[in-house]
Structures are given as structure tokens and as C-alpha cells.
Amino acid sequence: MERRFASQTVVITGGCRGIGEGIAERFGREGANLVLVSNAERVHETAARLVADTGAEVLPLVVDITDEAAVADLYAQAEARFGRIDVSVQNAGIITIDAFDRMPREDFDRVLQVNTTGVWLCCREAAKRMVAAGHGGRLINTSSGQGRQGFIYTPHYAASKMGVIGITQSLAHELARHGITVNAFCPGIIESEMWDYNDRVWGEILSTPEKRYGQGELMTEWVGNIPMKRAGTPADVAGLVAFLASADAAYITGQAINVDGGLIMS
């Protein structure tokens, strides 16, 4: 695989599983230094696996991305270790599923704190350092198909991901003069732990006495609505993210690009 990102440093939040791990593996195979961020200790296991599989240098960090001081410290550590920050992928995210009239306020607030405020804090800190260094950079944010249109039992998640697109477009205007592009991607159904949870909980809520969903059945039904007739993989998403981080995407900014097999066409 071409080493397009040799000597570049890529920060990836939510990097120890699912889409984030797939993105990290892609950048590692293309020569980047990796800063792998998660709120879970398992990030160290993922980092060790990436070193073995890709040969990349990896700095694993356990960070709460809703903590402003902790976010500043993570970028300081990244810069101290590798000397610069070229790409920052704001991928950390959470979801809960419940009817809006039963949803605890704590769930609503926490989803927005992680999915939207966390993205803003990381973009802000990464951009400060990119501007100061004067070499431009790439900010890439994880939105969702629900950033395009809301869905049942997840109003807080939809709001959080629509907010990510708003942040992306606003910062794209503000940072263009510094040579920093800001884009988002909107995954659909992607094989991951999050979608295992989605399949189980949505399946429980949407089941009726006439039709009960077993494990995997709801996801299979929904995949049938995708023109390409399959769920996506983290590697499918990683290919787009690597493109947006590359020199080939230097004139692309402020965009939110669907990665969903054609489920949402816009």
C-alpha cells in the first residue's frame, strides 16, 4: 500500500474499536504516526495490535473528550511525541435508544456532550496547533446518516450528528485561509459493536406480538433497503477518510459525505 502519510501525525478519537480502529489501521498501513484516543483502557491493546500489524508508531491515550483540559493535554502530548499534528479525526461517539418521552435527561445531555461538544473541543485544539505551525491540516468529523435525517427513538443522537455537520461547515469557512480543510462523513449501517447494540435495542423496541426480532434480524431487514445490499465495513469508511486527509482532497472542504451503500442519496 502506498505510504501517502509517511512522517505525518494523525489523531483519531474513538480509535480502539469499530470505525475508529479501521481508520487507524488504514493510516498506519499508509505510513502515519498514530495518536489513538479512547476513554477505555483497551486502547492499549488496540495500539499494540496496530504496531504489530502495520509497523506504525502509536501513542495510545485514555482521554475523556468532554473534558476541556484533558483534550488540550492530549494534543500537547501528541505534538511532544511526534512534533506536529497533520490530521485529526473526531470519531468518538455514543448512542442510546429510547422513546423520547421515556428518555432520561442525562442520556440526552451525555450524547450531545460526547458527539458534538467533544468534536468541537478536539477541532478547536487541533486547529490551534495547525494554525500556529503554519502547515495547514485536515479536520475530519464523524457524523451519521442521522446527521442527514432523524430516526425513531434517537432524537438526541440525530441532533448531535446534525450538530457535527454544522460545526464542520462553520469551521470550514473559518479555517480555509489557513490551509486547513474541514469535512465530515456520514456512515450508514456499518459492521461494528455499535450496530450490534442498535440491532438488539431497536429490535426489542420495534418487536410486536406478531413479529419479534431475533439477533441480527432487524439489521438484515434494514440492509435489504440498501441499494448495494450489504452492510458497510470499517474499511469502507477508512478509504474515504484517507482520501479526505490526502493531497488529492486539498480543494474539498465543508462537505458531509455519505458512506452508506446508497441508503441516503443527497
Stretch-by-stretch model annotation:
Residues 30-46:
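Conserved glycine-rich Rossmann-like NAD(P)H-binding loop of the short-chain dehydrogenase/reductase
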Residues 123, 160, 168:
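Active-site helix of classical SDR
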Residues 144:
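Residue(s) in the substrate-gating loop at a strand-loop-helix junction
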Residues 176, 181, 252-254:
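Short, small/polar-rich loop/turn modules that mediate ligand/substrate recognition or access, typified
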